Regions:
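Short loop/turn motifs that connect adjacent beta-strands in outer-membrane beta-barrel proteins
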Residues: 23-38, 54, 73-95, 137-146, ...
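Outer-membrane beta-barrel transmembrane domain signature
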Residues: 134, 156-244, 251-260, 264, ...
């Protein structure tokens, strides 16, 4: 739902409950059998991403993610956020709902731009909220998923102290018993408090940069839109279990006052690219 210091790829990892067409032995479990199966996927890798949301400087960071299901309760991490779905999945039309919790690490520390670095550091945001979604299965084969998710989380810490709302539309399908692909698009909506905290330039901020960054009052609204693609390829076994390799790419574009903010328009770019590669293991 957000821009993360850890790239958000866990939500795109192959879901052992719904994404596999066939086991290594050749049998064909039903989608309901797969959706009731306890499973755990752990992924580690490396990602390249901007220094801050709107920067044109990039860095390489380690990333990790988990996704699983236990007794009908599923969970996954997306960047630094944990989603827990409390609604068991059965049938062609499924629903999801549950809590989401995480942290936003966009603090302006350890960035390359020498002008933006002069601005005051930002606190880490601690965000708690909830999400809900709907999924439709079996559009092109019995194991694909078209899903829509909406989430909202509020900062309970000492950062932007506001609510962030995100939407994600995704389509995921196996193309063989060893290969899985997922494409998604989404948008994020934030408040005036969020916009001012991360993208506004106060008179004191402008003075701290020697006037290089002009005073700017940022308004909230739609912050950005994004699109991503992930491919997961089994190395051992199949998508039901074993070792796999994944690669993903994401493009996002800042809009409105977020694009016009001096830290983006003058010192960065509205176009943001993220990429990650790594290994995953499914039990």
């Amino acid at each position: 739902m957000r821009f993360f210091t850890c790239v958000a790829f866990a939500a795109c990892l192959a879901s052992p409950g719904l994404a596999q067409p066939q086991t290594a032995g050749g049998s064909l479990p039903s989608p309901d059998e797969l959706s009731s199966r306890d499973t755990l996927t752990v992924a580690v890798g490396g990602a390249i991403l901007p220094d801050y949301d709107g920067s044109d400087d990039y860095r390489i960071v380690p990333v990790g993610a988990i996704r699983g299901r236990y007794h009908g309760i599923s969970f996954d991490t997306s960047g630094t956020y944990l989603y827990v779905n409390l609604v068991p999945a059965h049938g062609k039309l499924t629903f999801e709902a549950g809590p989401v919790a995480g942290m936003r690490f966009d603090t302006r520390k350890d960035i390359e731009d020498h002008i933006v670095k002069l601005l005051p550091h930002r606190h880490r945001a601690v965000e708690l909220g909830a999400f809900a979604g709907i999924g439709l299965h079996g559009l092109t084969n019995p194991y694909d998923t078209l899903s829509l998710r909406v989430d909202a989380a509020h900062d309970i810490g000492n950062a932007h102290k506001s609510t962030v709302v995100g939407t994600t539309l995704s389509f995921s399908t196996p193309v063989s018993r060893k290969t899985y692909v997922s494409a998604s698009t989404g948008a994020e909506f934030v408040s005036n408090k969020f916009a001012d905290y991360y993208y506004g330039i106060s008179p004191a901020d402008s003075l701290a940069t020697g006037g290089v960054l002009p005073i700017f009052d940022a308004d909230g609204g739609m912050k950005d839109w994004k699109a991503s693609l992930l491919v997961n390829q089994s190395i051992t076994g199949d998508l039901l279990g074993g070792l796999s390799i994944f690669g993903m790419g994401q493009y996002s574009h800042l809009v409105g006052d977020f694009r016009r903010s001096p830290i983006v328009a003058d010192r960065g770019s509205a176009s943001q690219w993220l990429g990650a590669v790594g290994l995953a293991y499914t039990w």
